[in-house]
């Protein structure tokens, strides 16, 4: 699969462990691709839920996906600062159709004031039983929550204000071409 280039638009598809489609984002603009990572932006992007409901993202958001980490990061740029929504998820896979990953329910939300919350623990436990997550998978996911929290606490990558500013500026430049 040929990597998308800066300024290209891609579709993102989130699946559940049982293979069912969970959510789709249309027209995410690619800002950078490397061998292991894709950085993009959603801005008034159409999102379709598995039940057919549709909505549009409200604010620009820098999205970060990696082939080695079991999480992805959404930095939502708001008037009062940046908030984050982090999905504990499989490393991404890219094919001709979309960037794809498996969503494993656990989420970390960081508010503009820095407060952090681990979300959907009950949903994770329920799906772990229902979809038979292996002990190895459970271990990997929990270890990557620790890695994610370390990134947050140390302002690494997308959790750096400079990172968000650089990629938002690049998005504005590409959008206004």
From Swiss-Prot:
Its cofactor is Mg(2+). This is Nucleoside triphosphate/diphosphate phosphatase. Its EC number is 3.6.1.15, 3.6.1.6. It catalyses: a ribonucleoside 5'-triphosphate + H2O = a ribonucleoside 5'-diphosphate + phosphate + H(+); a ribonucleoside 5'-diphosphate + H2O = a ribonucleoside 5'-phosphate + phosphate + H(+). Mg(2+) 2 binds at residues 105, 107, 120, 123. Mg(2+) 1 binds at residues 87, 103, 107. The keyword Hydrolase applies. Belongs to the Ntdp family. Has nucleoside phosphatase activity towards nucleoside triphosphates and nucleoside diphosphates. Keywords: Hydrolase, Magnesium, Metal-binding. Disulfide bonds: none annotated. One of its GO terms (molecular function) is magnesium ion binding. The active site is at 23 (proton donor). PANTHER family: PTHR39159, UPF0374 PROTEIN YGAC. InterPro entries: DUF402, FomD-like_sf, Ntdp-like, SA1684. Coiled coil: none annotated.
């Amino acid at each position: 699969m040929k990597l998308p280039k800066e300024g290209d638009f891609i579709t993102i598809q989130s699946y559940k462990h049982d293979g069912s489609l969970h959510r789709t984002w249309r027209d995410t603009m690619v800002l950078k691709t490397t061998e292991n990572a894709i950085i993009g932006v959603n801005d008034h992007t159409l999102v379709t839920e598995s039940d057919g409901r549709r909505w549009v993202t409200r604010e620009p958001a820098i999205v970060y996906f990696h082939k080695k980490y079991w999480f992805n990061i959404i930095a939502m740029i708001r008037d009062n600062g940046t908030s984050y929504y982090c999905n504990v998820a499989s490393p991404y896979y890219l094919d001709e159709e979309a960037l794809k990953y498996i969503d494993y329910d656990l989420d970390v939300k960081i508010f503009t004031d820095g407060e952090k919350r681990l979300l959907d623990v009950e949903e994770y436990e329920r799906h772990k039983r229902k979809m038979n997550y292996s002990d190895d998978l459970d271990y990997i996911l929990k270890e990557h929550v620790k890695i994610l929290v370390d990134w947050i606490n140390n302002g690494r990558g997308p959790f750096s204000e400079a990172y968000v500013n650089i990629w938002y500026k690049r998005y504005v430049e590409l959008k206004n071409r």
